[in-house]
Regions:
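Nucleic-acid substrate recognition interfaces
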Residues: 1-277
Length: 277
């Protein structure tokens, strides 16, 4: 028996921006981080003074007045929806803390936080090969590549004729990625009464009573080789920090930065292998 249900499926695709687009993406992410930290700071200050919870609508009105000042006029260079959603996210995180669902929200550090920002689900546009980012100005010169359309790494991966939900763009330290939810009809098969036994192990991930075996991805030669390279690189980075230590402070040299970039690439490869298994 088949049952049709409407579901939201998340699709994640890598972006291939040019230099100008890359600069713009970082500007959007930094502005979103600033708006998040500002909203969180206002909530903490208000709570310390004995005030009630500030709603995101009140904070957005206050933020609009802040953008009109000369000191913060640079905030107008970024789409309004980016900062609006960042303030909403800060208020949501603050509410979750008081409901006991999560820890107290922390300020986003420029050094350690993941650069990311929101895109309006109505204004964002997709073609077979590109995505149009809201607020990115188009190039006026015919011989220049359009700035507002960013190339997608996978062709025809995201459908162009459907409703999108919660589009987010984030940077993982190597590449930019766009994540978007799409609604689709899923045919769900009603399970039968037949049972199956599953034996979880170390050599094999799982052995089923019907004879099917599922390999443990961590036992493959490729993953073992990458894990060995990772351990050696981690030890090398640790030695570099110790050798360049100045008193009680660790000094990050250009060589350490290169090694940490290689470590990031190794972790990225291992994550992709396990994700696709």
């Amino acid at each position: 028996m088949m049952v049709v249900k409407k579901m939201i499926k998340t699709i994640r695709v890598m972006l291939i921006p040019n230099n100008k687009q890359n600069t713009k993406l970082f500007r959007y992410a930094n502005t979103a981080r600033f708006a998040y930290n500002w909203a969180l700071g206002r909530e903490k200050e208000n709570y310390k003074n004995g005030g009630k919870f500030l709603s995101d609508s009140d904070l957005r009105k206050e933020f609009t007045q802040l953008k009109k000042t000369e000191e913060y006029s640079w905030l107008n260079e970024v789409s309004n929806n980016v900062t609006k959603q960042a303030i909403k996210d800060a208020c949501h995180a603050y509410k979750r803390f008081f409901k006991g669902c999560s820890k107290f929200p922390k300020f986003k550090s420029r050094k350690f936080s993941i650069p990311s920002f929101y895109q309006d689900n109505v204004k964002i546009q997709f073609s077979d090969t590109h995505v149009k980012i809201e607020g990115f100005a188009a190039s006026k010169k015919k011989n220049k590549q359009k700035i507002n359309w960013i190339r997608l790494a996978e062709k025809n991966r995201i459908p162009t004729d459907c409703n999108y939900s919660n589009p987010r763009i984030r940077y993982d330290g190597i590449n930019w990625w766009i994540t978007v939810g799409i609604e689709y009809e899923d045919s769900v098969t009603v399970p039968s009464n037949d049972g199956i036994g599953i034996d979880l192990g170390i050599k094999d991930l799982a052995i089923c009573s019907d004879g099917n075996k599922y390999k443990n991805i961590n036992k493959t030669k490729k993953v073992k080789k990458l894990e060995k390279q990772k351990r050696r690189l981690q030890r090398s980075i640790s030695r570099s920090y110790e050798n360049n230590k100045q008193g009680k402070e660790y000094c990050k040299t250009k060589n350490v930065i290169k090694k940490e970039k290689l470590l990031l690439i190794l972790n990225h490869r291992l994550t992709n292998i396990r994700h696709n298994h």
